[in-house]
Design a protein with these regions (language model features):
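N-terminal active-site beta-alpha-beta segment that forms phosphate/nucleotide-binding
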Residues: 1-123
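Conserved phosphate- and dinucleotide-binding cores of soluble alpha/beta proteins
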Residues: 86-175
Length: 175
């Protein structure tokens, strides 16, 4: 199937879910992700802030933020800067504001990435970093169809896609 057709179909299927279906599916994704040992053991969490009909990540972010008092962990969320995307560390959802596109983005300047953060010099990114990726569709070969802007692809190419764990989250019909 052509990517543009696939994107349109996945958006349609997500829009057609009832609020109750979405809630049940989001809760299951939350449970599956937060109990995954490869997820729980990380120190840096790069995670998108859900928008519209995307798989909900706000509850995941709240959960991670609640762990900061108990564990040495860091949460970073993306912000689009022109044609690029960067991640900024947050300590609260209150640090987010709506962009021109209506997407919640960090309203601070604590830029982090897997190559520049001094903290990473003491860490092995493969052991300590996870990125939660959005997507409209995923395949069994770990391929991902995003929204077509290439922001995540460019970011991963710039900073080394093989350096850390990446987890795509979606509803079952998106695979």
């Amino acid at each position: 199937m052509e990517k543009s057709v696939l994107r349109k179909e996945m958006k349609r299927l997500r829009r057609e879910m009832t609020a109750e279906e979405r809630k049940i599916r989001d809760e299951k994704i939350f449970e599956n992700l937060t109990t995954l040992s490869r997820f729980k053991d990380k120190k840096w969490f790069y995670i998108y802030v859900s928008y519209g009909t995307e798989t909900d990540t706000k509850e995941i972010i709240k959960y991670l933020l609640s762990l900061k008092d108990k564990k040495d962990i860091h949460i970073a969320v993306p912000k689009v800067l022109g044609t690029e995307m960067e991640f900024f560390e947050i300590d609260s959802l209150d640090e987010l504001k709506k962009s021109n596109m209506g997407i919640l983005e960090p309203n601070n300047h604590r830029l982090v990435n897997v190559k520049d953060v001094e903290y990473f010099e003491r860490l092995n990114p493969a052991e300590n970093v996870v990125m939660i990726l959005p997507g409209l569709a995923f395949d069994i070969e770990r391929g991902r169809a995003g929204y077509g802007g290439g922001f995540y692809d460019k970011y991963l190419n710039r900073y080394g896609a093989d350096d850390f764990l990446k987890i795509g989250i979606c509803y079952d019909f998106q695979m």
